[in-house]
Amino acid sequence: MRIAVLANLKINAPRWEGMSEDQWDDLDSPKTIDSIVAALQSGGHEAQFFEANILPPHNLIERLEAYQPDLCFNIAEGHFGNGREAQIPAVLEMLRLPYTGSQVLTLALALDKPLTKRVLLYHGLPT
């Protein structure tokens, strides 16, 4: 199986003056990505890492179309916006590429903690 590993590397994250030191703590390191790719390859799969960014120089959409993965192993966090974790899955759905992890709506909802709490309480789940 041909697998595209999608993530955001901390070293590639945007930076600006005055940003918090822990702004990108949830992003990944090259060591983590190398371990995931190696584990997939040891299982007999072809695996390649792609920076989860549609903008140049990363050009994720064009690179995925060229690679034609059977599956996208998605651990992308995104960089901006309330639904940042849902952005790459939304792109993958538009490209009709299967991916691991939660669906777009679930990821977007989970980042909105007050709305998530209201939905859970509505369904009788304590928070």
Regions found by a protein language model. Name each.
Residues M1-P98, V104-L105, L109-L111, L115, ...:
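ATP-binding N-terminal substructure of ATP-dependent carboxylate-amine bond-forming enzymes
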